[in-house]
Every structure is written in C-alpha cells, then in structure tokens.
Regions:
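Low-complexity, acidic/polar, glycine-enriched regions of mature
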Residues: 1-169
Length: 169
C-alpha cells in the first residue's frame, strides 16, 4: 500500500460499487467485546469539482446484506429493533462539500434510515492514486435504533475503503 496522498482528484464523476467498496462497522456488545460487521454498498458516486475536492458524495448501503459472522446476530440486526429491512432495506449517505485538511478531507454528511436523518462527519484520506479510506463515529440512537445499551453500545465506528473508478479522461 502506498503512502497517503492529498493530491487533487481529477474533476468529474467518480464511481464505486459492490466490488470496489467495503463498509465495515464496529460496536461493543453486552460483554464489552468489539463486534465487527460489514454492509454491502450497492453504489457510490463522488462528484469532484474543478479544484480537485469532492463536492458531493452519495452512497446506498444494503442493510439486508449485513454480516457480522453470526447468523443469529445478523438476523437480529435485520429485524425491527435495528435496521427493519422489511420497511426499507437501504441506508442512504449524502455529503459534501469536502473540506481540505493536511491529511485529506473532512466530509460532513448525513445518513438516512427510514427517513430518520443523522449527521455524520467522515475523515477521508487517500490510500493510493484512486483509493480512499473514510472513518467516522456515530451514535446509533441518532438513527432511531433504540435498544438497551446492555445489548449493544451506542457508539458505532464506521470505516469505508473504496477503490474509485475515475471519470473518463
């Protein structure tokens, strides 16, 4: 893996999809163990402005595809107390514009789960010429997920690794 770089991105519409994008999350369970899971990303688009900075980002995550390595836990997460995938199986993310930082960008945005919106700020840095890593922390209660803290901690750490497809030259 090459050293992180904050060089400007090529202006235009960058894309990523299920084969080039990974979203992972971490939360503590009742025994204070860290539970790690993944959510498939259906699609993502990054609109980059003429200054090489992301102006708009949109992504759709497939909640039905949640995978923590535990069939029972995954079933619970898909249920009404957590993601309620029968109601809507998609978690939407919209953000922008990005703010340049010495390490990359700060990307203020919003998650939308069943119409409940939650602000989230991603710290983004490049990990290669067309790849990025974004991290954020959020409180699951801000998305309306209200289960006892004895079951799962309220703070969730999210990491997204993306190999972006640049716009045509």
């Amino acid at each position: 893996m090459s050293a992180p770089t904050t060089d400007a991105l090529q202006a235009g519409r960058w894309t990523a999809g299920p084969t080039t994008l990974t979203a992972t999350f971490q939360a503590r369970d009742v025994l204070h163990r860290t539970v790690i899971g993944t959510l498939p990303v259906r699609s993502a688009v990054v609109e980059v402005g003429p200054d090489g900075r992301p102006e708009r980002v949109r992504a759709e995550l497939d909640l039905a595809g949640v995978d923590t390595g535990s069939t029972r836990r995954d079933h619970d997460l898909r249920g009404k107390r957590f993601f309620d995938v029968e109601r809507a199986g998609v978690l939407l993310f919209a953000a922008g514009p990005a703010i340049a930082t010495p390490a990359g960008w700060t990307l203020p945005g919003e998650l939308d789960l069943h119409g409940i919106r939650c602000p989230v700020v991603l710290e983004v840095h490049r990990t290669g010429p067309t790849s990025v890593r974004a991290t954020a922390q959020l409180d699951r209660r801000d998305l309306g997920i209200r289960v006892p803290r004895l079951m799962v901690g309220s703070v969730v750490t999210v990491t997204v690794d993306a190999d972006l497809v640049p716009p045509p030259a």
